[in-house]
Amino acid sequence: MILCPQSNMNVATGIAPARKYLERGLKVGLGSDLAGGSTLSIFRAITDSVVASKLRWRLVDQNLKPLSVADAFYMATRGGGSFFGKVGAFEEGFEMDAVVIDDSALYTPKKLSMHDRFERLCYLYTDSKIVAKCVAGKKIEID
Protein backbone atom coordinates (compact mmCIF):
# COMPACT_ATOMS: atom_id res chain seq x y z
CA MET A 1 0.00 0.00 0.00
CA ILE A 2 1.05 3.59 -0.51
CA LEU A 3 0.49 6.06 2.31
CA CYS A 4 -0.08 9.74 1.50
CA PRO A 5 -0.06 11.43 4.92
CA GLN A 6 -0.64 15.01 3.79
CA SER A 7 -3.63 14.01 1.69
CA ASN A 8 -5.06 11.93 4.55
CA MET A 9 -4.73 14.86 6.95
CA ASN A 10 -6.14 17.42 4.49
CA VAL A 11 -9.25 15.40 3.67
CA ALA A 12 -9.57 14.17 7.28
CA THR A 13 -9.59 10.45 6.47
CA GLY A 14 -7.50 9.60 9.51
CA ILE A 15 -3.94 8.64 10.36
CA ALA A 16 -2.77 5.29 9.05
CA PRO A 17 -1.10 2.95 11.56
CA ALA A 18 2.08 2.87 9.46
CA ARG A 19 4.19 1.30 12.21
CA LYS A 20 1.71 -1.60 12.51
CA TYR A 21 1.85 -2.17 8.74
CA LEU A 22 5.66 -2.25 8.79
CA GLU A 23 5.76 -4.59 11.80
CA ARG A 24 3.39 -6.98 10.01
CA GLY A 25 5.80 -7.10 7.07
CA LEU A 26 3.42 -5.45 4.63
CA LYS A 27 4.82 -3.62 1.60
CA VAL A 28 4.40 0.05 2.47
CA GLY A 29 5.42 2.95 0.26
CA LEU A 30 5.16 6.67 0.82
CA GLY A 31 3.59 9.03 -1.68
CA SER A 32 2.54 12.60 -2.23
CA ASP A 33 -1.03 12.90 -3.49
CA LEU A 34 -1.41 16.32 -5.06
CA ALA A 35 -5.18 15.86 -5.37
CA GLY A 36 -5.47 15.96 -1.58
CA GLY A 37 -2.18 17.57 -0.64
CA SER A 38 -0.34 20.75 -1.49
CA THR A 39 3.03 19.50 -2.76
CA LEU A 40 4.69 16.63 -4.60
CA SER A 41 7.78 16.82 -2.37
CA ILE A 42 8.74 13.38 -1.07
CA PHE A 43 10.73 15.12 1.67
CA ARG A 44 7.51 16.76 2.86
CA ALA A 45 5.80 13.35 2.72
CA ILE A 46 8.60 11.96 4.90
CA THR A 47 8.20 14.62 7.57
CA ASP A 48 4.39 14.55 7.39
CA SER A 49 4.40 10.78 7.94
CA VAL A 50 6.61 11.19 11.01
CA VAL A 51 4.40 13.96 12.42
CA ALA A 52 1.20 11.99 11.67
CA SER A 53 2.59 8.89 13.38
CA LYS A 54 3.49 10.97 16.45
CA LEU A 55 -0.07 12.30 16.59
CA ARG A 56 -1.46 8.77 16.23
CA TRP A 57 0.87 7.59 19.00
CA ARG A 58 -0.15 10.42 21.33
CA LEU A 59 -3.89 10.49 20.61
CA VAL A 60 -4.81 6.93 19.59
CA ASP A 61 -2.36 4.18 20.55
CA GLN A 62 0.62 4.80 22.82
CA ASN A 63 1.68 1.16 22.43
CA LEU A 64 2.52 1.76 18.77
CA LYS A 65 5.73 3.80 18.64
CA PRO A 66 5.89 6.64 16.11
CA LEU A 67 7.89 6.45 12.90
CA SER A 68 11.42 7.81 12.74
CA VAL A 69 12.76 9.75 9.77
CA ALA A 70 14.68 6.57 8.87
CA ASP A 71 11.42 4.57 8.82
CA ALA A 72 9.73 7.15 6.61
CA PHE A 73 12.77 7.34 4.30
CA TYR A 74 12.61 3.55 3.92
CA MET A 75 8.95 3.80 2.92
CA ALA A 76 9.79 6.60 0.45
CA THR A 77 12.60 4.63 -1.19
CA ARG A 78 12.86 0.88 -0.69
CA GLY A 79 9.24 0.47 0.41
CA GLY A 80 7.78 2.27 -2.58
CA GLY A 81 10.37 0.85 -4.95
CA SER A 82 9.38 -2.70 -3.99
CA PHE A 83 6.22 -2.28 -6.07
CA PHE A 84 8.20 -1.51 -9.24
CA GLY A 85 11.06 -4.01 -9.29
CA LYS A 86 14.70 -3.30 -8.61
CA VAL A 87 14.47 0.37 -7.65
CA GLY A 88 14.56 2.26 -4.38
CA ALA A 89 17.92 1.08 -3.06
CA PHE A 90 21.63 1.49 -3.74
CA GLU A 91 22.31 -2.20 -4.33
CA GLU A 92 23.94 -4.21 -7.06
CA GLY A 93 21.42 -5.02 -9.77
CA PHE A 94 19.13 -2.12 -8.86
CA GLU A 95 18.52 0.86 -11.15
CA MET A 96 20.38 3.98 -10.03
CA ASP A 97 17.81 6.66 -9.22
CA ALA A 98 19.16 9.46 -7.04
CA VAL A 99 19.35 13.15 -6.31
CA VAL A 100 22.46 15.00 -5.18
CA ILE A 101 21.61 17.63 -2.61
CA ASP A 102 23.77 20.50 -1.39
CA ASP A 103 23.01 21.21 2.26
CA SER A 104 25.94 23.58 2.82
CA ALA A 105 23.63 26.60 3.12
CA LEU A 106 21.84 25.02 6.09
CA TYR A 107 23.95 26.53 8.84
CA THR A 108 24.60 24.70 12.08
CA PRO A 109 26.92 25.77 14.90
CA LYS A 110 28.27 22.23 15.35
CA LYS A 111 29.28 19.32 13.15
CA LEU A 112 26.37 16.96 12.49
CA SER A 113 26.33 13.25 11.76
CA MET A 114 25.09 12.14 8.32
CA HIS A 115 21.85 10.98 9.99
CA ASP A 116 21.30 14.38 11.63
CA ARG A 117 22.15 16.23 8.40
CA PHE A 118 19.62 14.13 6.50
CA GLU A 119 16.91 14.66 9.12
CA ARG A 120 17.53 18.41 9.10
CA LEU A 121 17.37 18.40 5.29
CA CYS A 122 14.02 16.60 5.31
CA TYR A 123 12.48 19.27 7.52
CA LEU A 124 14.10 22.24 5.71
CA TYR A 125 14.08 20.93 2.12
CA THR A 126 13.46 23.08 -0.96
CA ASP A 127 13.97 22.12 -4.62
CA SER A 128 16.78 24.68 -4.91
CA LYS A 129 19.06 22.35 -2.93
CA ILE A 130 19.10 19.68 -5.69
CA VAL A 131 22.31 19.97 -7.71
CA ALA A 132 21.98 16.79 -9.82
CA LYS A 133 19.45 14.06 -10.67
CA CYS A 134 19.93 10.53 -12.02
CA VAL A 135 17.20 8.24 -13.34
CA ALA A 136 18.04 4.66 -14.35
CA GLY A 137 21.72 5.54 -14.03
CA LYS A 138 21.60 8.53 -16.39
CA LYS A 139 22.05 12.13 -15.34
CA ILE A 140 19.02 14.21 -16.31
CA GLU A 141 18.38 17.94 -16.57
CA ILE A 142 17.23 19.76 -13.47
CA ASP A 143 13.93 21.62 -13.98
Model-derived features: where do they sit?
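Catalytic beta/alpha-barrel core
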Residues: C4-N8, L34
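Context-gated lysine
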Residues: Q6, K20, K27, K54, ...
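His/Asp/Glu-enriched, well-ordered alpha-helical/loop segment
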Residues: G14-Y107
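Helical hairpin unit composed of two closely spaced alpha helices linked by a short loop
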Residues: N10-A12
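C-terminal cap of metal-dependent C-N hydrolases
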Residues: E95-D143
